[in-house]
Curated annotation (Swiss-Prot):
Keyword DNA damage belongs to the record: yes
Any GO molecular function: ATP-dependent DNA damage sensor activity
GO biological process: mismatch repair
Gene name tied to this protein: mutS
Organism ancestry: Bacteria, Pseudomonadati, Pseudomonadota, Betaproteobacteria, Rhodocyclales
Protein name: DNA mismatch repair protein MutS
Length: 872
């Protein structure tokens, strides 16, 4: 199917200026015909050294790229709006447009000037969309660019996604309410959905959304397309037959990707059905709150990824990002990864990890280079980088052999054993320092092809021939300053000054007359010129043919290269885990079949790097201790403590060591967080509504094997409403969900739950008052806190002193007031006089410091005047 059909699903499009194409100039007719096939994309139309855009495309590009909008004459009686970018800088403009979610069609000149009447022939050479990028210049080397197709049927969300840069093809079916969580996990660059699907949330989540015809999302079409592609009778071997909604999405995705690449997708060698149950459940709020790869402000650091990513290759960085967003529920693979990390750490000297990281240094992006080879758009320097990377593999395998051949390390070493003939082929074929593009020549190595060597020899010997000819002609003509030279405009020529023009032999034919010299050509020089120029053109054509043949020869190695790339990425990620363990003192966690979490000396991996003295804390949860009711002052460290427990569990389930003295972890199926909130203006939801929505998801989804983090639930509404909700939610978690819960609150009434539910333990993060200052200890202690120190924190924040004094007075009054039956009291009602309330007035403080028996009459008088001034 053509991309034009994919894009024209709603209605027939008119030409950009709303007139019949035939009324335009021939060149504009050619442009409009191409544009008609791609109405929803920007068209870059090659004209000489520029890519031009016209009409509405020009206006849009000028606005998005901040380039000049001008006019270029008229067509059909109307001015042609035009904007353009130089061809040599096109990649940077494409990158900017793709980041903005735009797609671009590039039409190149394919004809020869003057070969036909009318404009030079042009044809579409590339279609660039956010989800189908393969060029290194357009891709973020540390983040995957995924193309995702989604469909909905009877409450089932079917998804298919493709990483075109490396050929990974995945499917999943899940409940429709999982949409946001899945999008937060996958972060697709471009999304395809049926034209008839009404899904407002998708409009918000998708960075680049494209609607396709409903009939393209058909499971039967998927069977036909995919069995043809994989060369199988059915799809049973891939285990995807049970997911018809996802298969329909896969059909639309495959057709779209193939149309954009304009060729077969040879590197799509498999199809895998993922299931939600494979991974720890992390909803969108949890991924944000734990700041795995982005801070709450949307910045790349400081995050867990920015801390751990010391990878030597871009493949390793992408593997690490993926691993953090895909903690595995089955602990077999995480345990195997931890065994490999332990092998790299060794006895604590880190020599194995250092050796592996040293061998990986300088390894290119084999993953994406392999994809470009399969798509036949690999550039010469891709192949030279692949050659250099493959040459490092023997050293890397030798290092792994010294570590051991058991477990995951042995499997990775085996995957690195790529056939030696592949490296030999690249060493023979590609020049040591090839040109950037095949069209520039100098790509194929000398000695690889006899015909190419002969043609290059003609060019190489050109200088010797010209020097010999110049010497002979000087002797024959007697003109001592005669020169034989070359330029691109006039080719080869013999140059003679006007003063010697009468001495030239009869066989000289004038080629050009200049102010001071005459330029000639002879039959011998003309014959050599034809041969030399022909050799250059033939050499370039031969080199292009050899390069295409080389890509063909590399195709059978694509599966092996894909396996090698996966092994390199995994090894790099595991080495980064080992580096973190060595650098920060992480330990190997222990997985247990008994429910619970037992952490000694736990730390927050990111926060501990931001502060000078981080206080370690223990955490113990189990069947008889399912909830920790955490109280304590603001800034005391409650949120940090809860997050560190969650991050330690997550790191264990991705296969890393953890920041603790020890950690024993029982089975987990999910991590839920309700930490902080802000208004969701786009959806019209208040802070409290966001808070309740997240709490609802937890109460409906958490199980006895889930870790739940609840931070100050109920604070977004009135005091009694919030307290009532917090109490009811805590009881539900204890009675119904029976989750392992960390429940932080300032409602001290909740600490009474311990009397009704022994499995709810009270703990607090303490603080002490030192003079007029408050010191946060950040240490977790048993029992409830004595107070929240909220007013003291307000003073630290710079709230004016009169406000602080007024707040203290009102707090004392509220604490002394009996809360009776009836409606909720008004916090802002006038306070009754309270003569017994001790006020911290400066006069009272000064009086308390006076010892009357020790004062002389003069000192007493001075103190009296001082008190008078204080009371003024």
């Amino acid at each position: 199917m053509s991309i034009s059909k994919i894009e024209s699903v709603n209605a027939e499009k008119q030409s950009p200026v709303g007139t019949e194409i035939g009324t335009h100039t021939p060149m504009m007719q050619q442009y409009l015909r191409i544009k008609e096939q791609h109405p929803d994309t920007l068209l870059f139309y090659r004209m000489g050294d520029f890519y031009e855009l016209f009409f509405e495309d020009a206006e849009k590009a000028a606005r998005l790229l901040d380039i000049t909008l001008t006019t270029r004459g008229q067509s059909a009686g109307m001015p042609i709006r035009m904007a353009g970018v130089p061809f040599h800088a096109v990649e940077q403009y494409l990158a900017r447009l793709v980041k903005l979610g735009e797609s671009v069609v590039i039409a190149e000149q394919v004809g020869e000037p003057g070969a036909t009447k009318g404009p030079m022939e042009r044809a579409v050479s590339r279609i660039v969309t956010p989800g189908t990028l393969t060029d290194a210049a357009l891709l973020d080397d540390r983040r995957d660019a995924l193309l995702l197709a989604a469909n909905m049927h009877r409450g089932v969300l079917g998804m298919a996604w493709l990483n075109l840069a490396n050929g990974e093809f995945r499917l999943m079916e899940c409940p429709a309410e999982s949409l946001q969580a899945q999008f937060e996990r996958l972060r697709p660059a471009e999304v395809l959905i049926p034209d008839g699907l009404a899904l407002p949330l998708m409009e918000t989540l998708a960075p680049a959304l494209r609607r396709l015809a409903d009939w393209q999302f058909d499971a039967d079409t998927a069977h036909r397309l995919l069995t043809t592609h994989f060369g199988t009778r059915d799809l049973a071997g891939f285990g995807v037959e049970e997911a018809p909604v996802a298969l329909g999405a896969a059909a639309a995705l495959y057709d779209y990707a193939k149309a954009t690449q304009r060729q077969s997708l040879a590197h799509l060698t498999g199809l895998r059905l993922e299931r939600e149950a494979e991974f720890l459940r992390l909803d969108a709020a949890t991924r944000r709150n734990l700041e795995l790869t982005e801070t709450l402000r949307g910045e790349p650091s400081p995050t867990l990824l920015s801390l751990l990513d010391t990878c030597m290759t871009s493949m390793g960085s992408r593997w690490l990002r993926h691993a953090l967003h895909h903690p595995l529920r089955d602990r077999t693979i995480p345990a195997a990864r931890q065994q490999a990390v332990a092998a790299l750490v060794g006895d604590g000297d880190g020599l194995h990890a250092q050796a592996v990281r040293g061998a990986l240094r300088g390894v290119a992006d084999v993953d994406r280079i392999t994809g470009r080879i399969a798509l036949r758009n690999a550039r010469p320097r891709d192949l030279s980088a692949l050659r250099e990377s493959l040459s490092r593999l023997p050293e890397l395998r030798q290092t792994l052999a010294q570590i051991g051949d058991e477990g995951m390390v042995g499997g990775l070493a085996a995957a690195l054993d790529v056939q030696p003939e592949l490296l030999q082929c690249l060493q023979r074929a590609i020049a040591d320092e090839p040109a950037a593009m095949v069209r520039d020549g100098g790509v194929i190595a000398a000695g690889y092809d006899a015909e190419l060597d002969e043609l290059r020899g003609i060019q190489t010997n050109c200088g010797e021939f010209l020097m010999a000819l110049e010497a002979r002609e000087r002797e024959r003509s007697g003109i001592a300053n005669l020169k034989v030279e070359f330029n691109k405009v006039h080719g080869f020529y013999i140059e003679v000054s006007h003063a010697n023009a009468d001495k030239v032999p009869d066989d000289y034919r004038r080629r050009q007359t200049l102010k001071n010299v005459e330029r000639y050509i002879t039959p011998e020089l003309k014959a050599f010129e034809d041969k030399a120029l022909s050799a250059q053109e033939r050499a370039l054509a031969r080199e292009k043919a050899l390069y295409e043949a080389l890509l063909d020869a590399l195709s059978p190695y694509i599966p092996a290269l894909q396996g090698c790339a996966r092994a390199l990425a995994t090894l790099d990620g595991l080495a980064a885990f080992a580096e973190a363990a060595l650098r920060y003192g992480y330990v190997r966690p222990v997985f247990s079949d008994q429910p619970g979490i037992e952490i000694r000396g736990g730390r927050h991996p990111v926060v501990e790097r931001q502060v000078e003295d981080f206080i370690q804390n223990d955490a113990r949860l189990g069947s008889t201790r399912r909830m920790l009711m955490i109280t304590g002052p603001n800034m005391g460290g409650k949120s940090t403590f809860m997050r560190q427990v969650a991050l330690i569990c997550l790191l264990a389930h991705v296969g890393s060591f953890v920041p603790a003295q020890s950690a024993v972890l029982g089975p987990l199926d999910a991590i839920f967080t309700r930490i902080g909130a802000s208004d969701d203006l786009a959806s019209g939801r208040s802070t409290f509504m966001v808070e309740m929505t997240e709490a609802s998801a937890i109460l409906h989804g958490a199980t006895e094997h889930s870790l739940v983090l609840m931070d100050e639930i109920g604070r977004g509404t009135s005091t009694f409403d919030g307290l009532a909700l917090a109490f009811a939610i805590a009881r539900h978690l204890l009675e119904k969900n029976r989750s392992l819960t960390l429940f932080a609150t300032h409602y001290f009434e909740l600490t009474r739950l311990n009397g009704e539910y022994p499995e709810c333990a009270n703990v607090h993060l303490d603080a002490v008052e030192h003079g007029h200052r408050i010191v946060f200890l950040h240490a977790l202690e048993d029992g409830p806190a004595s107070q929240s120190y909220g007013i003291e924190v307000a003073a630290l924040a710079g709230i004016p002193a009169p406000v602080i004094r007024d707040a203290k007075r009102r707090l004392r009054a509220l604490e002394n007031r009996e809360v009776g039956a009836g409606p909720q009291a008004d916090l802002f009602a006038a306070l009754p006089d309270d003569d017994d309330a001790p006020l911290s007035h400066p006069v009272l403080i000064a009086l308390a410091e006076i010892d009357p028996d020790s004062l002389s009459p003069r000192e007493a008088l001075e103190r009296l005047y001082a008190l008078k001034r204080l009371s003024a």
